[in-house]
A protein has these predicted regions:
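Extended, non-catalytic substrate-recognition/exosite surfaces adjacent to catalytic cores, especially
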Residues: 1-36
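Active-site Gly/Thr loop motif
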Residues: 31-59
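Exposed alpha-helical structural elements
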Residues: 23, 27, 40-44, 171
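Soluble, non-transmembrane domains of envelope/secretory-pathway proteins that act on or interact
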Residues: 2, 7-16, 50-178
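Glycine-rich loops and low-complexity Gly/Arg-rich segments
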Residues: 26, 36, 44-45, 103-107
Length: 178
């Protein structure tokens, strides 16, 4: 923790232990980088800090009591929180409170670039506008990392159809029920 005047209040040097597969860590950080590149944090951080490839995630608790943002660069994981001591609604959401605070932090503590290197079994796959994998180069709208040991086997597969009336597609729910 660093005080407003730049004084270090608390610093920790924890020993790292692998908690998840490298592929899972990569996919999570990639998704969090998209929050800064194209999502909630793009407007506030993208133009000023885009070259650092930051990763982040906004959060808002029920009734707008708390505003959260987690920012990750090549050196630090920073969590910012804004809320009221009496747990009443602050009127802030992740992007209007804690994200702004994190941006101000970066103004005073320049980040290091977070350059991700895909581990083994992560393939860059072309995707069309409907979310289908494309391997012939026709209709590609973007590329996405995919955790697979056989990228070629995914060619031509159709994206699962969304089931009506569900909060999440059935195939997604099934992944977590196993």
């Amino acid at each position: 923790m660093i005080a407003e005047d730049g004084t270090v209040i608390y610093q920790s040097f924890p020993q790292a232990q692998r908690a998840v597969a490298p592929q899972a860590a990569y996919m999570t950080l990639y998704g969090m980088q998209q929050v800064v590149e194209r999502g909630t944090a793009a407007r506030r951080l993208g133009s000023k800090f885009g070259k650092y490839h930051l990763a982040g995630k906004t959060g808002t608790t029920n009734l707008m009591r708390d505003s959260w943002f987690v920012g990750i660069d090549g050196k630090e994981v920073t969590v910012s929180w804004m809320g009221l001591d009496d747990n009443s609604p602050s009127g802030l959401y992740g992007g209007s409170g804690a994200l702004v605070l994190y941006g101000r932090y970066l103004d005073n503590q320049p980040p290091l670039a977070l350059n991700l290197t895909p581990p083994e079994d992560i393939a860059e796959m072309a995707v069309d506008a409907d979310g289908n994998f494309v391997c012939n180069g026709v209709g590609v709208t973007r590329t996405l990392p995919v955790w697979t040991t056989d990228a070629q086997a995914l060619c031509g597969q159709q994206a699962p159809a969304q089931q009506q009336g569900e909060e999440a597609p059935g195939w997604l729910k099934e992944m977590f029920e196993q």
